[in-house]
Swiss-Prot record:
CC cofactor: Mg(2+)
Quaternary organization: Component of the RNA degradosome, which is a multiprotein complex involved in RNA processing and mRNA degradation.
Name this polypeptide is given: Polyribonucleotide nucleotidyltransferase
Similarity section: Belongs to the polyribonucleotide nucleotidyltransferase family.
Gene3D superfamilies linked to this entry: GHMP Kinase, N-terminal domain, K Homology domain, type 1, Nucleic acid-binding proteins
All copies of domain S1 motif, residue ranges: 621-689
HAMAP family, alphabetized: PNPase (MF_01595)
Pfam families with a match to the protein in the record: KH_1 (PF00013), PNPase (PF03726), RNase_PH (PF01138), RNase_PH_C (PF03725), S1 (PF00575)
Length: 699
């Protein structure tokens, strides 16, 4: 074994890259560490591409092992199962910036596996995973236009912080991840507390500048440990076939893209492609139809991009900065706690909000520790939304990613647990889609939350921006269609309020995206966002004054913390009886806070009355209605409050002499008693004869 190690300082931490010891049969394997957080990254690529393949089969698998945090997995099998939501999101985070760095035409299968083998609870594993992946690809010999750098940027007390710790992120107004090459930013993912556009742009530039140390270190690591580059050359286009296809299809594509309705346009594009293929097959029956499909796609892309760059109207007839027609409806479903239907052009989201108690919150046990998530947002993209058939089942990677982006956009305006003691689940059903469905989910979520009476700080809207760039010419597009996303050079999603940005996601397919272009995109996005917010506020401008009649109402009371055990009872018997008999949900906290949830106001009042009974102190001199629970020779024990019994001595039963207690009292008999004394040991002395006056009894 011949280990090769490269170490360098990066922000507050030391980063170490090591190869040559572990997983030596992979094309490349790097053990990457940042502090005590360590990941093993392996890369394997197939030397030959499958014949006729027309896509690049890159797979990124990110897996967190519980042993990394010194834990044993839960569940019956006691081993790791399918990827968690967090693992899926980090896999996407790694995939997005590396995918565009593989050369065009490269169709060989590549698999990247990142395994977290040690974790420091203060250092998240995502950044070192991205760095380790970049290093492994750099030394693998697989064609890759890297290296790639990655950085997390925080914003604390008006200053940017490089790779903040978990504790620092908690105090930060920004949590942004940026990845890029030496000359270009490729990917941004962020969550922010409504920060101004200039702060967001500054954080991207700061992160890209700081990660140059990573890019330089990986280049040096590659020089020392890199394998020979594969002998691979990009396939050469058949220029004669390209010319034939242009002659057969260009005019048809130009005409088809005059059609503004998506389904009609798609039908006409299909006609143009079918006619071109038919003509080519007639001339040459041996023509490669897969190559023809690829070349038709390239021509289609050039036609659309050329129209935009020449200043012609967009596919649906809009100008570059125009937002599609909006339709906003709140309260569209009668029995949900909150609902909204948000439509922007041919993109539509039906969004619902459900309120629950604290026990409905999501409990997450990851290698970074346990946490509770009171706000959940789930995004569903059924096949009918794009007029197709398909599998319906558990959420795919894309649905998880889009849901998390919408969650980030909204989270900054959510109320605290003290302001609003409910768990909140939002579901966005995409019922129509033609671009920017995740941002439609942000808008719909804001509306549904307000309809449910959730006191969010202000409305939030989201917009997707696009870019078409050739040389020095570029056009920034607002509210992009699905086709513009597919054919363009950038997908730039911005969510925020009137005051600032709450989430920013950017994926760039080309180099040369300058600070100027990002600045224009952010400013154009701000104008579009304000326009959408104005329309949304006309439908519902602030949260409803009260929650839905169908939602559980949570009432909070305080009791003496020492009385919590009395409310719970032996083996939970008391609280179980309380919840079953009143039909409420009751939650207790260590500080004596009691939360009673029910959609029935009378049930809540009854639960409060009984809890107050259980926790109230016995008062000397007060009269109570009680029940005889035990008879002894010297008197009777009477229950006066839940869990509170007292003794009526034989001498205190009547003014007359009592020879036998059973002659005057029987079990379960209701009697009125007066508290005469509570001694130091908490024993209660009662009297029936002293309570014979007309004083009202305590229930």
């Amino acid at each position: 074994m011949n280990p090769i190690v490269k170490s360098f300082e990066y922000g507050q931490h030391t980063v170490t890259l090591e190869t040559g010891v572990i997983a030596r049969q992979a094309d490349a394997a790097v053990l990457a560490s940042m502090g005590d957080t360590t990941v093993l990254v392996t890369v394997v690529g197939k030397k030959e591409a499958e014949a006729g393949r027309d896509f690049f089969p890159l797979t990124v698998n990110y897996q967190e092992k519980t042993y990394a945090a010194g834990k044993i997995p839960g569940g019956f099998f006691k081993r790791e199962g399918r990827p968690s939501e967090e693992e899926t999101l980090i896999a996407r985070l790694i995939d997005r910036p590396i995918r565009p760095l593989f050369p065009n035409g490269f169709k060989n299968e590549v698999q990247v596996i990142i395994t977290v083998v040690s974790v420091d609870p203060e250092i998240e594993p995502d950044i070192i995973s991205m760095i380790g992946t970049s290093a492994a690809l750099a030394i693998s010999g697989i064609p890759f236009n890297g290296p790639l750098g990655a950085a997390r940027v925080g914003y604390i007390n008006g200053e940017y912080v490089l790779n903040p710790t978990v504790k620092q992120i908690g105090a930060s107004q920004l949590n942004l991840v940026v990845a890029g090459t030496e000359s270009a930013v490729l990917m941004v993912e962020s969550e922010a507390q409504a920060l101004p556009e200039e702060v967001m742009l500054g954080s991207v530039v700061y992160g890209h500048d700081q990660q140059q140390v990573v890019i330089k270190a990986i280049a040096e690591f590659k020089a020392e440990a890199g394998k020979p580059t594969w002998d691979w050359t990009a396939p050469v286009e058949d220029e004669a076939l390209v010319a034939q296809i242009k002659e057969l299809a260009e005019a048809g594509f130009i005409e088809a893209y005059q059609i503004q309705v998506k389904q009609e346009r798609y039908a006409q594009v299909a006609v143009v492609k079918a006619a071109a293929k038919e003509a080519l097959l007639a001339a040459n029956p041996d023509v490669d139809l897969r190559e023809v499909d690829n070349l038709l796609g390239s021509l289609e892309k050039k036609v659309v991009r050329g129209r935009i760059l020449r200043g012609m109207p967009r596919i649906d007839g809009r100008e570059p900065d125009m937002v599609r027609a909006l339709s906003v409806l709140a309260g569209v479903l009668p029995r949900t706690h909150g609902s909204a239907l948000f439509t922007r052009g041919e993109t539509q989201a039906l969004v619902t909000c459900t309120l629950g108690t604290e026990r409905d919150a999501q409990k997450i046990d990851s290698i970074m520790g346990e946490r509770t998530n009171r706000f959940m947002l789930h995004y569903n993209f059924p096949p009918y939304s794009v007029g197709e058939t398909g599998m319906v089942g558990s959420p795919k990677r894309r649905e998880i990613g889009h849901g998390k982006l919408a969650w980030r956009g909204i989270n900054a305006v959510m109320p605290s647990a003290e302001e609003f003691p409910y768990s909140v689940r939002v579901v966005s059903e995409i019922t129509e889609s033609n671009g920017s469905s995740s941002m439609a989910s942000v808008c719909g979520t804001s509306l549904a939350l307000m309809d449910a009476g959730v006191p969010i700080k202000t409305s939030v809207a989201g917009i997707a921006m696009g870019l078409v760039k050739e040389g020095d010419d570029f056009v920034v597009l607002s509210d992009i269609l699905g086709d513009e996303d597919h054919l363009g050079d950038m997908d730039f999603k911005v969510a925020g309020t009137r005051d600032g940005v709450t989430a920013l996601q950017m994926d760039i397919k080309i180099e040369g995206i300058t600070k100027e272009i990002m600045e224009i995109a952010l400013q154009q996005a701000y104008g579009a966002r304000v326009h959408i917010l104005n329309v949304m506020d006309q439908a519902i401008g602030s949260h409803r004054a009260d929650i839905s009649d169908h939602a559980p109402r949570i009432t909070t009371i305080k009791i003496n913390p020492e009385k919590i055990r009395d409310v719970i009872g032996k083996g939970g018997a008391v609280i179980r009886a309380l919840t079953e008999e009143t039909g409420t949900t009751i939650e207790l906290e260590d500080d004596g806070t009691v939360k009673i949830a029910s959609s029935n106001g009378e049930a809540t009042k009854e639960a409060i009355r009984r809890i107050e009974e259980i926790t109230s102190e016995v008062e000397v001199g007060r009269i109570y209605n009680g029940k005889v629970i035990r008879i002894v020779d010297f008197g009777a024990f009477v229950n006066i409050l839940p869990g509170k019994d007292g003794l009526v001595h034989i001498s205190q039963i009547s003014d007359e002499r009592v020879a036998n207690v059973s002659d005057h009292l029987e079990l379960n008999q209701e009697v009125t008693v007066k508290v005469m004394e509570v001694d130091r040991q908490g024993r209660v002395r009662l009297s029936i004869k002293e309570a014979q006056t007309k004083e009202p009894a305590a229930e």
